[in-house]
Amino acid sequence: MSRLAAAVRSPLVRVRASSAEARPSRRAFAPLRRVPTAAWVCALIALLNAATWSLIVPPFEGKDESDHFAYVEQIVENGSLPENGQQNGNYSNQEDLVLAGLHADEVIHSPQHTSISSEAEQRALIEANHAGASLRGSGEAGIATSEPPLYYTIEAIPYLLARGNILLQLQLMRLVGALFGAMTALFTFLFLREILPRSPWAATVGALAVALQPSLAFMSGSVNPDSMLFAVAAAVFYCLARAFRRGLTARLAIALGIGIAVGFLTKLNFVGFAFGAYVGLLVLAVREARARGRRLLLLPLLAAVIGALPVGLYALRNVLQSHHTLGLASSGGSLLAPGELWHLISYVWQFYLPRLPGMTHYFRGLATYKDIWFDRSVGLYGWMDTMFPSWVDNVALFPAALVAGLFLRGALARRKTLRRRLPELGVYAAIVLGLLVLIGGSSYDSDALNHSPAFAEPRYLLPLLPLLGAVFALAVRGAGRRWAPAAGAALIVLVFGFDVVSQLQVIARYYG
């Protein structure tokens, strides 16, 4: 009997041992299982939306797409970064042939010219795509030359998978951007659930409205580091909101630090966003020290150090190679000189708000808050050459005003709760301020000082999409209990219609 019992027990022991070994892997996926189904639905919708846009927009008609593709090509084919200090180098012969086959020079910035359509043009493009010309360029990547390398390193994977076919490479790279768009919607949902824990349905409405934004889908359906920047920014928003609501744990501090570090490695614009993120770490440090003792100051410090590591390593590398310590960012210090500071403040103010008495006129004949930031947010696609007629922008003021009114009503109804959360709201305001000042300062340097185009593109504000989702969610709650479901449904239908009409506008532009 003892032998029989041992024989029966031994398989059971092995099963228990194997299940015990499987537990760590299950624990690793436990956070994913806790994500609500609604969050995955929002992410899937954002993915499908961006993938649809990636198919609608012709090759290399995404903003600066040829430059970003050249950056990836430089990494893979030359094994180095495009950093020779020039932004006007030549693409590879193969990329030039494909661009010529697409008639890119005629189509870009020229709405009167549509994309290629005849059979002869299609055959010429196919021949150019399979010409087998050199893939080595001048070592530059146009406007993308100065950007950090992380996004482009990730895009090297689809580039290698479809090697030898630029058009297929581009499409696969666009789909990677669509995945980043899905991550943006996912983290936006999680952020809204943290700041509105008692209104999960409102969080769903806000995240869905973000997932269906045509500007997000257009940028995520293009080869552009903005797509990854939006996802990273949404993740940082979520980590900050979770820290303010539940406290900063060691795991959350590491995640927040990694998010900041990835942001620095994704795009230079994250510098402005990071200002608010570090303000958030400072506020959390003060709060945690008061509530649980100074020992917990180590957690915000840990997040800050992890986040700053890429900047420190980049500065050390440049010092060792006798470059500017912070690369292009080093030149920004001249804007803070006493003689320039007032002009900078005046320009940045007028970049977003009406001019005050005594300020120099920088935007004569323009109401920047309407003509640039609102009208171009309604629709600005392609190489800033595809937009709606002005009457559409004026009509869009009515639903925008309605959403703003409902948002204010919802905020006023919860003013006591908001007052208790002023430190957290102040951090989000610091993120907004840091990003606005960075964009405005960069535009001042380009426009006012060097007489180049201004950085007047609403896409630069899309890292703030989680806050837009919060506006939508509070607007729906502002409609009151009775009308909130109808308001939420109407909002989703409105945004979805906006997305579809925007797609039709792009189709008419390139294929009409």
Where are these regions (language model features)?
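Interfacial juxtamembrane loops and adjacent helix segments
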Residues: E77-M173, P338, K370-M387
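Transmembrane-helix signature of polytopic, membrane-embedded enzymes
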Residues: L161, L167, T188-L212
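Transmembrane-helix motifs of polytopic, lipid-linked glycan transferases
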Residues: Q171-L196, A235
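Membrane-interface transmembrane helices that cradle and orient dolichyl/undecaprenyl
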Residues: L196, V236-L252, A285
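Short acidic/glycine- and proline-prone juxtamembrane loop motifs at membrane-interface regions
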Residues: S215-L229
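Perimembrane helix-loop-helix junctions
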Residues: C239, R245, F273-A308, L316, ...
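Membrane-interface alpha helices of multi-pass inner-membrane proteins
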Residues: L252-L268, F273-A274, I306-L309
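Hydrophobic, aromatic-rich transmembrane alpha-helices
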Residues: A367-L425, A429, F472
